[in-house]
Every structure is written in C-alpha cells, then in structure tokens.
From Swiss-Prot:
SUPFAM superfamilies (alphabetical): TRAF domain-like
Domain MATH: 7-133
Lineage, broadest ranks: Eukaryota, Viridiplantae, Streptophyta, Embryophyta, Tracheophyta
Signal sequence interval, chain numbering: none
SMART domains: MATH
Protein name in the entry: MATH domain and coiled-coil domain-containing protein At3g58370
Length: 326
C-alpha cells in the first residue's frame, strides 16, 4: 500500500485490492491539522451490505489526554481513475472523542461497481482513496506540535494550553488566517455571516439562554449548528441512517449549551420522515416495475398466442375447391 500526504489531504493507494485476504485494512497514520489519523476500510464489505465501508479514525487515541475532543468536517472520495466526474465522494462533520473514535460511511460504493471491468475504480489492481479535512477544531493537546509540522494548512484549531485554558491558534504563522466577524456575540467566518444573520432573524431568541461565554467555544457551537443545517439541506436519499443518528446527537450537544433548537428538531424529524417516505416509495416503485415487467412479458406472450391463433384460424377458414371435393 502507498500513501501521500499533501496539505489537508491524504491519498491512500491500496494495491492488489482484488486479492486482499483481510476483512478490514488500515492506512498508514497521517497528520492533518496537528492531529494523527488513519483510514479504515472493509474491502469485502461489512456484515450489513455488499459495499465498501470506509472510515476516518483517530490514531493512537490512548496517547491523548483525558477529555480530548475533535470536531472535523471532512470528505472521503473513491477516485475514478478514468474520469473525476464518476468519483464517489461523501461528506461528513463529526465530533470525535474517546467513545467515538471514527466516522465514515458503511456504504461508500457497491462492491460490484467497484470491481466492474473498465469502471475506473480498480485500475491495475489499485484503488485510490482521498480524505480531505476542511475544518478542524481540537480540544485537548495536539498530537504533533506546530513547529514539527511541514505543511501549511488553513485549519481552525481550539486547544487546551498547559493550564487547561482555551486558546485559539492558526496552524502556523504562514497559514492564511480568516478574519472572524461578530454576529450577535458569535465570532464567525465571513462565509458564515449571512447564514448566522438569517438564523437570528428567523429565531431571535434561540441563543437567549446560551451559557458558554468563551468566544471560541461559542464559535464551536455555531459551527456545529451550521453543519447540522448543511446536513439537513441534502437530498433525503443521500442521507444515511448514520448521518441522521449523528445529527440527533449533535442537536442534543448544542441544546446542552443552552441553544433553543425546537425549530431544528422539527426539521430533523421532517427530513427523517421524508427519507423514510423516499425509501418506502422506492421500494413500491421497484415492486411496481417488477410487476410491470411481468405484465409486459405476459402481453408479449398473449400477443404471440393471438398471432398463432389468427394464423390457425386463417388456415382453417379456407373453402374447399371443386377439385378438393371431387
């Protein structure tokens, strides 16, 4: 297996994929945003389905201090080596901690599609996977100090200093720094301003009982909230059960800080209902299509039968000639 680490991306090349004998495999550890990670894959599928399962996992978690946490917005991509348009990409945001070391997708791509000849996912026995972490916030010690990092990554980090006080740093001084803007007491990125303003306009009192005073923790809560909203804006059929379970956990986490999210809970319930409706509707459509195929086949058989009967009738319905009678 080969790997390559560039900025906030890590590429994992799995060689001899078709002949792997292991039920699960791990990438080499890599560092993004001062944190160690590795990828976990199930090349033969898991017990729930016949698809490649893929996860981002915290590496060497036992070495981390008590109470550590990480929030990451990340994507996992199965590269199509013939055309990028067919690459299979999934996005997630998740809190990682001692009880939740990994997050990802149980059904990244169906194994028949992955192994299909000339499909572009398995080329010369190799499968290429890319993980990209676009937003990272850390509570606890970093795995790797800023001085020892070789990459310049514009990732956000929250960490505890030696006195367990919360401080905010960019990855290093050469990294581009995004200036934050105050919106109703929350420091947010320029790209988030309009979204946060819209939330306050529609729900003016939703943060009236918000308890945390530290501006970095407040930013963390708002980031989680915006991630939740982004999740709910996806097509229901694109959301997995894991996505919705994590969304429910995230809602509880944010509400514990004092934010009133009854409006978001209703939307989450609505999305869950829509997803269920889509799933049951697709099942009904599939059954209807199968029945239609059977009916079409029956129609073809009846048409052939009618043609044969018409031919037999036409053949029999011929008068005898004088010569035939005599």
């Amino acid at each position: 297996m080969e790997s390559e680490e560039v900025d906030n991306k890590f590429t994992w090349v799995i060689k001899n994929f078709s002949t792997l004998q292991y039920d699960k495999i791990y990438s080499d550890p890599f560092v993004i945003g001062g944190c160690k990670w590795h990828l976990l894959a199930y090349p033969k599928g898991n017990k729930f389905n016949n698809s490649l399962s893929l996860y981002l996992v915290v590496d060497d978690a036992r070495a981390l201090p008590c109470g550590w946490r990480r929030y990451a917005q990340f994507s996992l991509t199965i590269i199509n080596q013939l055309t990028d348009k067919l690459s299979q990409r999934g996005e997630k945001q998740n809190w990682f901690n001692q009880r939740n070391l990994g997050s990802g997708f149980t059904s990244m791509i169906p194994l028949p599609n992955l192994h299909a000849k000339n499909a572009g996912y398995l080329v010369n026995g190799e499968v290429k996977i890319v993980v990209e972490i676009n937003d990272l916030e850390v509570i606890g010690k970093l795995d790797v100090s800023e001085e020892s990092e070789e990459t310049n990554q514009p990732l956000k980090k929250i960490k505890l200093d030696d006195n367990d006080a919360v401080s905010f740093d960019s990855l290093n001084e050469t990294s581009p720094v995004k200036e934050s803007i105050d919106v109703n007491g929350f420091q947010v990125l320029p790209s988030q301003v309009e979204s946060v303003k819209c939330i306050f306009e529609r729900h003016p009192d939703f943060a009236s009982k918000f308890r945390p005073k530290n501006r970095h923790l407040k930013s963390t809560y708002m980031t989680v909230l915006l991630g939740l909203i982004k999740t709910l804006c996806q097509l229901p059929e694109e959301l997995t059960d894991d996505d919705l379970d994590e969304a429910s956990v995230a809602v509880s986490y944010v509400e514990n800080g004092g934010l009133r999210l009854d409006w978001l809970e209703k939307k989450l319930a609505e999305v869950k209902a829509k997803k269920k409706k889509v799933e049951t509707g697709k099942a009904r459509l599939q059954r209807a299509e199968e029945e239609l195929q059977k009916l079409n086949q029956k129609c073809l058989e009846l048409k052939a039968f009618l043609e044969k009967e018409n031919a037999d009738v036409s053949e029999a319905n011929v008068p005898l000639s004088f010569e035939d009678v005599v």
